[in-house]
Design a protein with these regions (language model features):
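Histidine-centered metal-chelating micro-motifs
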Residues: 61-63, 81, 98, 102-109, ...
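Glycine- and acidic-residue-biased ligand/ion/polar-headgroup-sensing regions
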Residues: 67-86, 96
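Sec/Tat signal peptide C-region and signal peptidase I cleavage site
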Residues: 18-22
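A short glycine-rich, His/Asp/Glu-containing loop-to-beta-strand
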Residues: 27-64, 122
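Short acidic-glycine-tyrosine-enriched beta hairpin
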Residues: 86-103
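Ligand-binding loop in jelly-roll beta-barrel domains
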Residues: 89, 103-128
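Bacterial N-terminal signal peptides
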Residues: 6-17
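Positively charged n-region of N-terminal signal peptides that target proteins for export
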Residues: 1-4
Length: 136
């Protein structure tokens, strides 16, 4: 049996009016950027939602790390190259999004020599879970 969390109820109530409102002039209409199934979602009664921003100068990268829950990344400016252990690197451009899978070692780069990279990160986890686990 599926249980609705308070967060899912908020999203459901917001989305329920989209079709009607989208047809009326003067109302903004959301555009789907990413729709992806996933595993490793937190199951506890208390969850923490984090929305973070990050800016990378040309050539900067993240530490080698993993996450315990999926992480959604939306690219605002520049291009983000994601390297997941055992997989070919993937580059995500401005206006696109990706989901970083849980429990996979990874690093992310701004491979540009001249352009900055700006992104937004969405992370939902059990309350006490850290955002990332550095891999040494």
């Amino acid at each position: 049996m599926h249980r609705l969390t308070p967060l899912s109820l908020v999203f459901a109530s917001l989305l329920s009016g989209i079709p009607a409102a989208a047809q009326d002039p003067g109302f903004a209409r959301p555009n789907l950027v990413l729709k992806e199934g996933g595993t490793g979602m937190p199951r506890g009664d208390k969850q923490k939602v984090r929305v973070l921003t990050a800016s990378f100068k040309p050539g900067e990268r993240t530490v080698f790390h993993s996450h315990r829950s999926p992480v959604t990344v939306v690219i605002l400016e520049g291009a983000f190259t994601l390297e997941l252990e055992g997989r070919a690197p993937v580059t995500i451009a401005a206006g696109q999004a990706c989901v970083e899978p849980p429990n996979v070692k990874m690093t992310g780069y701004n491979r540009s020599a001249s352009e900055a990279l700006k992104l937004v990160i969405f992370y939902v986890s059990d309350h006490q879970t850290p955002f990332l686990d550095p891999v040494h």
